[in-house]
């Protein structure tokens, strides 16, 4: 594959609601990335480019980006249903699901319902301690993390206001605790934990409870990296995802633990703009928003 290969925007118009997604490569998908609250699939563009030896997909969750709006249903279960539909339609073989924050919950819910579709599960700094998201935690994170602010939708049309209403009303509540979701998936799981001192949302208690619930858990802590791991340290995330794929290929994953040492923040100015969640302030579509019908 060309070193300059880039993910391409696609639109699955036959689905209800319509699902926008990015794709890279033309083979059988190996990895599917799921973004968090307020973001779009483009947040994973640097990661997808760094793993371009693998065919990858990354959907916009319902109500986000260019995916369709859903009247009154922005629950984790509904989003997981969309993800399952995408896997069934576009992934003929089991994939690795990589979900960040809210996307981690969506990925866990999908894996618990249809484990046969999923080869491995990567949960990136999702707060696992509560089924019901705490808006105060997210407000604090957004206030303290400038990089995160640049990763959420900038234009109103890119995020259905009802998504935030559902979040604050508790409609994002997961169907059961995280450890119960993990118990239903017997494949390998990786927890990638950001630094709590830098705004990371996955706690040490989250990790401990998950380790007790799942016998094949791989845990890595990112020292000095905040919640938006894929933005603040895309290189480190690429390395960890590639390593997890190697673990899967070698058939070994049993309570492995590691730490990604703190490194200088990446020069993300132009990268974040490219990977960001919203369209330009004028509302005009950028090149990345030009849709190709599959």
Predicted regions and their residues:
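Flexible "cap/lid" loop of the alpha/beta hydrolase fold
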Residues: 105-112, 119-148
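Conserved alpha/beta-hydrolase "nucleophile elbow" surrounding the catalytic nucleophile
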Residues: 35, 95, 99-101
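Conserved acidic catalytic loop of the alpha/beta-hydrolase fold
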Residues: 78-95
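Conserved HGGG/HGGXW glycine-rich cap/lid loop of the alpha/beta-hydrolase fold
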Residues: 22-66
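Alpha/beta-hydrolase fold catalytic core
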Residues: 1-31, 52-55, 92-93, 119, ...
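Conserved loop-alpha-helix segment in the C-terminal half of the alpha/beta-hydrolase fold
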Residues: 193-225
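Hydrophobic, aromatic-rich cap/lid helix
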Residues: 151-187, 193-198
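Catalytic histidine-centered segment of alpha/beta-hydrolase-like enzymes
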Residues: 225-234
């Amino acid at each position: 594959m060309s070193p300059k290969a880039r993910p391409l925007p696609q639109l699955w118009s036959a689905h209800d609601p319509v699902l926008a997604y990015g794709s890279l490569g033309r083979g059988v998908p190996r990895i599917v990335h799921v973004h968090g609250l307020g973001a779009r699939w483009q947040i994973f563009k640097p990661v997808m480019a760094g793993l371009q030896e693998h065919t990858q997909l990354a959907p916009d969750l319902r109500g986000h980006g260019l995916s369709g709006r859903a009247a009154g249903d922005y629950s984790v279960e509904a989003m997981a249903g969309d993800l399952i539909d995408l896997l069934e339609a576009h992934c003929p073989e089991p994939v690795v699901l990589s979900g960040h924050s809210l996307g981690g919950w969506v990925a866990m819910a999908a894996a618990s319902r249809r484990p046969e579709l999923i080869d491995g599960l990567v949960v990136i700094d999702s707060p696992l301690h509560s089924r019901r998201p705490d808006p105060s935690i997210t407000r604090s994170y957004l206030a303290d993390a400038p990089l995160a602010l640049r990763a959420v939708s900038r234009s109103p049309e890119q995020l259905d206001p009802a998504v935030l209403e559902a979040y604050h009303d508790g409609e994002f509540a997961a169907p059961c605790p995280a450890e119960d979701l993990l118990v239903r998936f017997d494949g390998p799981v990786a927890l990638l934990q950001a630094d709590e001192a830098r705004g990371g949302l996955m706690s040490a208690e989250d990790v401990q409870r998950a380790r007790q619930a799942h016998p094949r858990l791989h845990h890595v802590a990112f020292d000095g990296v905040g919640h938006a791991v894929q933005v603040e340290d895309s290189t480190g995330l690429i390395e960890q995802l590639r390593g997890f794929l190697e673990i899967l290929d070698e058939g070994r994953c049993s309570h492995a633990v590691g730490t990604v040492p703190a490194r200088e923040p990446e020069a993300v100015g132009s990268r974040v703009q490219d990977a960001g969640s919203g369209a330009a302030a004028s509302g005009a579509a950028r090149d990345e928003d030009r849709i190709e019908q599959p």
